[in-house]
């Protein structure tokens, strides 16, 4: 079995893709589904999210650009904001600067796509090992097209879990992520010291960074579930 870490999204995933945008999209996605959202519909663009609402009027819109809530949307991209339970039973359409785009990239070819974060790191590692047949790829979303320390650290945490569970052929990306994990301090330190962590702190969103640094507090696995009933331009993720 191969274990691969892409420091930025690639275009070919033959088997399992674990998509990470730890600050904050995939952490928020886990939280939305954990708080009872019926389903999560990820879109690449704001326009696509608004188009979904035209066809499915009862959805909630969640998303950010530049770290801030998109004007006219119901929610931002804050795991702290969505942890209050107001999303229970609702369909949520989500678009973010980096994470939802990475999910769409992975979904072009991967047989299994899962949203991964530190909060569900152990659960997604076990799930990936259970469903993979040839390769597990950990896909870092990055920040505005550049490698993000926060995602690489989180990838290293998941890679470390996987190596404790099975034998793998490890690529250089995985070695880089493991080195970052082992030398990066605890999760809070690593995320706060990242460029994106610092940006969120400047925006007054340090509580989101602290939330995202929690390790394996959730067993929820947001899993891509395609279907003819999924609105155009969206990917449907359900709680697994």
Swiss-Prot record:
Gene name of the record: comB
A molecular function (GO) term: 2-phosphosulfolactate phosphatase activity
Protein name in UniProt: Probable 2-phosphosulfolactate phosphatase
Source taxonomy: Bacteria, Thermotogati, Deinococcota, Deinococci, Deinococcales
Entry keyword Magnesium: yes
Domain of life, source organism: Bacteria
UniProt cofactor(s): Mg(2+)
Family as reported in the entry's similarity comment: Belongs to the ComB family.
One protein family per Pfam: 2-ph_phosp
Matching NCBIfam families: PRK14100.1
EC supergroup of this enzyme: hydrolase
């Amino acid at each position: 079995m191969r274990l691969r870490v892409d420091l930025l999204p690639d275009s070919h995933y033959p088997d399992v893709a674990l998509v990470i945008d730890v600050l904050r999209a995939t952490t928020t996605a886990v939280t939305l589904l954990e708080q009872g959202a019926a389903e999560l519909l990820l879109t690449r663009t704001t326009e696509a999210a608004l188009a979904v609402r035209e066809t499915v009027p009862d959805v909630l819109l969640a998303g950010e650009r530049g770290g801030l809530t998109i004007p006219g949307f119901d929610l931002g991209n804050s795991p702290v904001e969505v942890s209050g339970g107001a999303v229970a039973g609702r369909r949520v359409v989500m678009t973010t600067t980096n994470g939802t785009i990475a999910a769409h990239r992975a979904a072009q070819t991967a047989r299994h796509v899962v949203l991964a974060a530190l909060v569900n790191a152990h659960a997604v590692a076990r799930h990936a090992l259970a469903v993979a047949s040839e390769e597990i790829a950990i896909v870092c979303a990055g920040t505005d097209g550049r490698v993000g320390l926060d995602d690489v650290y989180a990838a290293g945490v998941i890679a470390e879990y996987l190596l404790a569970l099975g034998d793998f052929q490890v690529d250089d990306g995985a070695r880089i992520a493991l080195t970052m994990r082992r030398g990066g301090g605890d999760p809070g330190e690593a995320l706060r010291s990242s460029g994106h962590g610092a940006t969120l702190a400047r925006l007054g969103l340090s509580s989101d960074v602290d939330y995202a640094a929690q390790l394996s507090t959730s067993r929820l696995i947001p899993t891509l579930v395609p279907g003819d009933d999924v609105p155009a331009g969206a990917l449907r993720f359900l709680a697994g």
